[in-house]
Amino acid sequence: QGSHGVRTSYQESFNFSQWGCGTLEGIPTFCSEQMIISPVGLDNEFTALRRLGIDDPFLLLSIDPNCICATPYHMISSQLEELLLGKNPRGTIGTGVGRACRMFHESGDTLTLRAIELTDKTLIRKKLQRQCEYYRAKYDEAVKTSILPEDMAIAEDNLALLADDGYLQYCLELFEAIGKRLKFMDLPEALCQAGTAIVECSHGVLTDAGMGFSPHVSAIRTLPKYTNEMLRTAGYDGRIINLAVHRAYEIRHGAGPMPTYDRNFTEAMLPGSHKDENRWQGIVRAGALDLNLFRYALECCKETPIDGLCLTWFDQIIKNNRIWPICSAYEGKTSIDKNDVDFLKNTACPVIQEHAIPQTSNDFELFRVVKEILRQYIELPLTML
C-alpha cells in the first residue's frame, strides 16, 4: 500500500497503491475488507491513471463496503509518531495505513471511517472531526516536549493541520467526491467473476506484525495463511497457489536490519533514489539478494507453504554489468548495533558470491541460467511467466 512499481511489456511504468498491478492491462481490481483504502490516494491515483489514457479508472475498481479508510489525520499521526522516536527510527511509509489499523483495534467504529460511509456526508464529517480531536489531544503536549529541535518545523506543520478547519473541509469535500464514484461489492460476489483471481498482498512477510523484525513491522498480518483463510471464509473451495514475489536483489526503504546493504550497489541499481528520502521513512537501501532472510520468510509461511517464486526486476541486474550478487550465509557473530548510522546494520559479514549472467538475448536461456543458480541455494519451483 506504499506502492508497487510496474513496467508493462510495452514499457509503460506506474506505481500502484490503490488499484491493482494489472490495471494498465485492463484487469479489474477488487479491494477486500482486509485492504485499508485511502480516499486521498484514490484521488491522486485516479488523476495519474487518467494521464496514462485510462478514461475512467473507477470502472476498473470495486471495493468491499467494510474497508477501513486511512485519512490525512492518520497520515499526520504516522509521521508524528516517527518523529517522536527521535534517533531510534522504526520506519513508516507515512500514509497512515498502520495508524488506521491501530485506531480500529483500539476504538472500533467510533472513530473508524468505513468505505460505505463515504456515501454519507454527515458521517464523514463526524468521524473526521473525531479523529482530528483525538489526535490533537494526543500530540499537542507531546510535540512540545519530545520532538528533536531539527524536527520541530515538520511537527508544527502537522499540528497546524490538526487545528485547521479549512483542511477539515477540504478532506470532507474530497472524501464525498470519492464516495460518489465508488462501486461496492463483497468478496463472495467478487469471486463469482469469470477468470482467475490474483490476490495481491501489500506488505512483505518480514514486516508481518507477529513474525517480522520488531519494531520494524506493519500493524497488519502479511502471511499467506490469512489470505487463504479469507478465501475459504468466503466459500471458495478451489485450488489456491501461493507464490512468493521477490526482487532479484534486496531493497528496503527506511529503518530496519539489512545485512547486505551496499551504497555502491544501491546507486547502481537505483541511481539517485537515495535523494528521495523523507524524515519518517528514511533512505532507500539496496544490496545483494539475501537468501538467509528469504529462507526465514519461507519458514514464517510454513503453515501455508509457498508453491513457487516470482523473481522480479531482473532487468536491473542485466543493466548492472550482468553481475548478480547473492548472499547465502553470514560470517562472524550476528549482532545489532543500535547506534549505527546505517539503521541497525548487522555486524556479521554477509558472504556474497557474484554470478555472471552470460550475454544472451534469449529469455528462455536467461531463465535457465537463473534457475540453475538458485537451485544451488533453495529448493523452490521457479517458473517463467
Show where each model-derived region lies:
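Non-transmembrane, aqueous-exposed alpha-helical and coiled segments at domain scale
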Residues: Q1-L385
